[in-house]
């Protein structure tokens, strides 16, 4: 029997995920859990790098995100689902890996440079974020990491740290490989299709939340940016027609129709017609998802039990890896 490979991923509980997160991440997880030993965390420690809110908000958001995972058919019987903070080995390994990471490597991270723009006081957690991410991945002897294009640099640093450690101490860590989703890995902002759809954007018209009301979804897609071509031309061209390409990507992913086939079916159609079709596809998916979510979210005891069970499974793997790490560098295990 062929041994299943391990796959690891996670999301911060920084609010309800967007349609972009659903298409590019959560739907992929559902598929991947059938193929790999899937380990999915709620990254509440990463959340702290940018958020200093009271504990009740973080706890609520963590359970909200877990309910979203489950509503997207991430199955706790097939996948290990847990809270990052419940496994102290993440922080312990992160400290050790800090000692194998160079300051210059961290300051060169593109996301770090973006996040510190116009900020006076930069917390250390923001700088060392990629090291904690490396410990998340390496702690579970991860073979495969699904990443968006904006996370490739962080994963490459994880691989570099693992190789550096292994060179000194033997084959302690598996060197993880990446898998990148196709079109859906980057659904763009509705009002600025040159930027990724993100819930951190202050303009709520830029993104569709998975819990948006139908009237809000209709209005957001109605106002989505297209272009001024007359007559309208509905074809996929990210450079020349980013708005149209984004709408085509959304309907392609949700309806499972090839982009080329969509271009043929939308030939000589208006932009209004395209937007109506996209709206229908989004409403169709989110109606089902929201019904599941609100049913699951009501049962807080059930959600907490899932996290407890997942933590036990995750801790068993994490302890084994940290024991191996400690022994390799001379830290005593009793």
Curated annotation (Swiss-Prot):
The keyword ATP-binding applies. GO terms for cellular component: cytosol. Keywords: Aminoacyl-tRNA synthetase, ATP-binding, Cytoplasm, Ligase, Nucleotide-binding, Protein biosynthesis. Pfam families: tRNA-synt_1b. A motif ('HIGH' region) lies at residues 13-21. ATP binds at residues 12-14, 20-21, 148-150, 187, 196-200. It is found in: Cytoplasm. One of its GO terms (biological process) is tryptophanyl-tRNA aminoacylation. It catalyses: tRNA(Trp) + L-tryptophan + ATP = L-tryptophyl-tRNA(Trp) + AMP + diphosphate + H(+). Its EC number is 6.1.1.2. The keyword Aminoacyl-tRNA synthetase applies. L-tryptophan binds at residue 136. PANTHER family: TRYPTOPHAN--TRNA LIGASE, MITOCHONDRIAL. Catalyzes the attachment of tryptophan to tRNA(Trp). Homodimer. Belongs to the class-I aminoacyl-tRNA synthetase family. This is Tryptophan--tRNA ligase. The lineage of its organism: Bacteria, Pseudomonadati, Pseudomonadota, Gammaproteobacteria, Enterobacterales.
């Amino acid at each position: 029997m062929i041994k299943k490979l391990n796959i690891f991923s996670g999301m911060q509980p920084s609010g309800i995920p967007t349609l972009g997160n659903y298409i590019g991440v959560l739907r992929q997880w559902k598929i991947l859990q059938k193929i790999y030993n899937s380990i999915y965390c709620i990254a509440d420690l990463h959340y702290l790098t940018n958020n200093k809110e009271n504990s009740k908000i973080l706890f609520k958001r963590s359970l909200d995100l877990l309910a979203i995972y489950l509503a997207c058919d991430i199955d706790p019987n097939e996948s290990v689902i847990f809270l990052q903070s419940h496994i102290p080995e993440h922080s312990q390994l992160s400290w050790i890996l800090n000692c194998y990471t160079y300051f210059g490597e961290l300051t060169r991270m593109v996301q770090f440079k973006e996040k510190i723009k116009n900020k006076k006081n930069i917390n250390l957690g923001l700088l060392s974020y990629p090291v904690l991410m490396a410990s998340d991945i390496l702690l579970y002897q991860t073979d495969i990491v699904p990443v968006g294009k904006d996370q490739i640099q962080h994963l490459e640093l994880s691989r570099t740290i693992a190789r550096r450690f292994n060179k000194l101490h033997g084959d302690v860590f598996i060197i993880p490989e990446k898998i990148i989703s196709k079109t859906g890995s980057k659904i763009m902002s509705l009002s600025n299709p040159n930027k990724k759809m993100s819930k951190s954007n202050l303009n709520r018209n830029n993104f569709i939340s998975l819990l948006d009301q139908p009237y809000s979804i209709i209005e957001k897609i109605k106002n989505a940016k297209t272009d001024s071509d007359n007559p309208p031309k509905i074809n996929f061209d990210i450079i020349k027609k980013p708005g149209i390409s984004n709408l085509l990507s959304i309907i392609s992913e949700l309806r499972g129709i090839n982009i080329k086939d969509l271009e043929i079916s939308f030939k000589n159609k208006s932009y209004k017609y395209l937007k109506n079709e996209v709206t229908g596809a989004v409403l169709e998916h989110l109606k089902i998802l929201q019904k599941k979510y609100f049913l699951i979210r009501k049962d807080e005891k059930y959600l907490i039990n899932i996290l407890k069970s997942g933590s036990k499974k995750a801790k068993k793997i994490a302890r084994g890896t940290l024991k191996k790490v400690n022994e390799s560098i001379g830290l005593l295990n009793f």
